[in-house]
Swiss-Prot record:
The keyword Protein transport does not apply. The gene is argS. A motif ('HIGH' region) lies at residues 126-136. This is Arginine--tRNA ligase. It holds the Pfam family tRNA-synt_1d. Belongs to the class-I aminoacyl-tRNA synthetase family. GO terms for cellular component: cytoplasm. It is an enzyme of class 6 (ligase).
Length: 574
């Protein structure tokens, strides 16, 4: 796909080359600052220096010499000092963008930059035998948005849910189930029972040292493949994943793989040996395998008792992914507090000779806080579990939908409430830089005004409502002239719709879904201004009405695509 703004840049380059004054290899087209009345700029300093001419004179000469062809997307060409400024031809741009959105449909905004390359995205990663809480939601939501964005960039994307299903804590869980019995419930209730068993055993263990030995024995039995230990462990894994899947289904999250840490168990001895042989790690006086790389703090790869740690399993995971998927990128969507861990992981992997030409990326994120700024924490007693959070969001959205749309059927109101409530949770996470902490502020999250998912969904539903009414009144036409869209608010909206492919590229380059969220918000805002200033169904002429209806349709389709990249539904009604 070659979009309008790409053709615009090509037109500029061709027009400059056609003057014979600057060769193609000296032309670099940039986006000017917002206060510059231009869409693209050629800054002549570098070219003028190479050609031995004055940059101001070169810009002026080019402005005089350039004559865009009749079908070019170039509008005006002006020189300001050493800056050669280009504006888009508004009518030709409108025709091009309307045609692209109609032709490409759901694929509008997608590009082929990542063709024949693979990205592995590691996200969500809940712990087995524990309920998912709001602490898991950021990785899940950000990771799923990155999956959508990189697929839109043309990559083959492998979404991997790296489950925390191994480690010393399982000795306690298995010992607790043997001591007190396994939970009899299902779903979240069973998960809550497991957590209570773990806490009960942990508390008793402090005053009863033999219980600690028992937990250690179960941990060792699990590692050695004891059938009873493995059966109990698998029961915990299956129970946890069934409960987690209900949350994933509501959030629209789909994984390609869900390999747990246990999957890499057989690789660990080989990984430790490779780390030693490559010189990436060494044995200390206590017999532990440690590494000290890139001026980072020393870290353990294998404990002195022979046990492995998180980083051991993470090294094995990278090795497997390189062999299995041959990726160009491996992206980890993990809490910012793990930043040092990933610096150490990437350093030792490269010191072992792996992933030398692969982008290893850690996408960090902040914590979720209450409206008064307090972090949500199990220890503080204010932790919110994910299922409860989603239920609460949908219940609040249902109250709003019932109040605003009482004539809709109960089934339709329930569907809209689910889309709006879940959308509010997702957008609240994605609309800003992920490094920042986010706040659970329901009033803002569910407002149909301002920067919220509900506002964006309402804008989309408003577009669809206008189009339904136009269809009912026989106003839709196949004969449309986008060149009639000359009002400034129409042209601003068209220009912004044209930016979606650029926003997708920027979001991928920065690993930042908030770029798409910002594009969606600006789309809704520009549509609101257009709708206020330009009557659609009561336009001055039928031809202008047809052009504006086409713009409404294009806005709805592009906004739906933008929301889909974030994992948010776009209801037809609200």
């Amino acid at each position: 796909m070659r979009y309008a703004l790409e053709r615009f840049i090509s037109d500029i380059q061709a027009a400059i080359v056609a003057t014979g004054k600057v060769p193609a290899d000296l032309i670099e087209i940039t986006t000017p600052k917002p206060n510059i009345p231009a869409d693209r700029t050629f800054v002549t300093f570098k070219a003028a220096k190479a050609l031995g001419v004055d940059p101001v004179r070169l810009a002026a000469d080019l402005a005089t010499a350039i004559v865009p062809p009749p079908d070019s997307l170039i509008g005006e060409v002006t020189a300001t000092g050493a800056f050669l400024n280009f504006t888009l031809h508004p009518q030709r741009l409108a025709a091009a963008v309307m045609a692209e959105i109609e032709t490409y449909g759901d694929a509008y905004g997608s590009v082929a930059d990542g063709a024949n390359r693979t990205v592995v995205i590691d996200y969500s990663s809940p712990n087995i035998a524990k309920r998912m809480h709001v602490g898991h939601i950021r990785s899940t939501i950000i990771g799923q948005a990155l999956v959508h964005i990189f697929r839109a960039l043309g990559y083959r994307v492998i979404g991997d849910n790296h489950l925390g299903d191994w480690g010393t804590q399982f000795g306690i869980i298995l010992a607790a189930m043997q001591r007190y019995g396994r939970p009899q419930n299902e779903g979240e209730a069973a998960m809550a029972e497991l957590e209570a068993l773990y806490a009960r055993y942990n508390a008793e263990m402090k005053d009863n040292p033999p219980l600690e030995d028992e937990a250690r024995r179960w941990s060792l039995a699990l590692e050695q493949g004891d059938p009873t230990a493995r059966e109990l462990w698998q029961w915990c894994v299956d129970l946890t994943m069934r409960a987690a899947q209900r949350n994933y289904d509501r959030l629209g999250v789909r994984f390609d793989y869900a390999y747990g840490e246990s999957f890499y168990e057989a690789m660990l001895p080989g990984v430790i040996e490779e780390a030693l042989q490559s010189g990436a790690a060494f044995r200390d006086v206590d017999g532990a395998v440690v590494a000290e790389l890139d001026k980072l703090p020393r870290f353990i790869v294998q404990r002195s008792d022979g046990g492995t740690v998180y980083i051991t399993r993470d090294i094995a995971t990278i090795k497997f992914r390189l062999q299995e998927f041959n990726p160009s990128h491996i992206i980890y969507v993990v809490d910012a507090r793990q930043e040092l861990h990933f610096r150490q992981l990437f350093a030792i992997v490269r010191a072992m000779g792996y992933a030398l030409d692969v982008e290893l990326i850690h996408v960090p994120f902040g914590v979720i806080t209450t409206p008064d700024g307090q972090p949500l924490s199990t220890k503080k007693g204010n932790m919110v579990y994910l299922e409860s959070l989603l239920d609460d969001a949908v219940a609040r959205a249902r109250a709003l939908v019932d109040a605003k749309s009482p004539t809709l059927s109960p089934e339709e109101r329930a569907q809209i409430a689910e889309a709006v409530g879940i959308g509010a949770v997702i957008y609240n996470d994605l609309y800003q830089d992920p490094r920042r902490n986010i706040t659970l502020d329901w009033d803002r999250m569910l407002s149909i005004e301002g920067n919220s998912a509900a506002y964006l969904q309402y804008s989309h539903a408003r577009c669809r409502s206008i189009l339904r009414r136009a269809a009912e009144e026989g106003m839709l036409s196949t004969e449309v002239d986008p060149g009639l869209l000359t009002h400034p608010s129409e042209q601003r909206l068209v220009r912004h719709l044209a930016r979606l492919p650029e926003a997708v590229r920027e979001a991928g380059a920065r690993y930042a879904p908030f770029v798409i969220a910002d594009w969606c918000y600006t789309t809704a805002r520009e549509f609101g201004i257009f709708f206020e200033q330009c009557p659609v169904l009561r336009a001055e002429t039928p031809a202008l009405r047809a052009a504006r209806l086409q713009l409404v349709s294009a806005t709805a389709n592009a906004l739906r695509n933008g929301l889909a990249l974030l994992g948010i539904q776009a209801p037809e009604r609200m």
